[in-house]
Each structure stands twice: as structure tokens, then as C-alpha cells.
């Protein structure tokens, strides 16, 4: 009897992640829908990517985004048959750790992560697009 009980308990414990996965996925979908330009997850991703860019491309080891202000959405392209990715175009003013203010433009793309789960964030800080990836003055993201 104790072996049967332990086997059942172990089976239930191993199946628990499988049962909770849809619930977690539901939470992720709700979270993803709630993401807007000022969502903390989006801003954290931008800040992290900017630190890497500042260190690796501009050789500014301590430069970071210190604060965001005037966050706004200026365009939203919803997902359609002819446009499979929903995109939210945003802008903001940032204060860098050296005290300088800059304009930042960014896009949040929905459903472009692994297996179409997750979002992608691309950004351009005015004056920091050394290779003109987003054209002069971050034009592509404006």
C-alpha cells in the first residue's frame, strides 16, 4: 500500500508541470496583450540591450539608460493576413547615466519569439546608431 501511494504521489508531482503549463501559457498571453510602450518588461529589455550596445559598440562601459519620460505610442499595426506580425511603434525621452537626454524610438513586435511565443523589441537611441541600422535619426522606427 505505501508503495502504491508513493507511486501515485510521484506520478502526480511529475504531471504537475504539464497541468500548470496551459495556465502559465494563458498568463503569458494575457501579459503579452497588456504590453504597451511603457510596460516594465519592454523598458527593461531596452535598457539591457542598450547597456550591451554601449559597452560593445561604443566602448562606453558605464553608460546606461537612467530614466524614461514622455513615453508614447505613435503607431500600431495589427496582425492581419497580409501582415503576420503585430507591431507597436513607440517613442520616449531617455536620460542616460551621464546626464544627457536623448530621444529613443522602438518597436514591440508580438509573437516573434521561439514557436511564436514572446515578443521582440528593437530600438534606436538618437546619436547611438553608429552603423545607421535604422537610417539617419532612427527614421525606420519613427
Named regions from a protein language model:
Residues 100-121:
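Extracytosolic low-complexity repeat regions of secreted or lipid-anchored proteins
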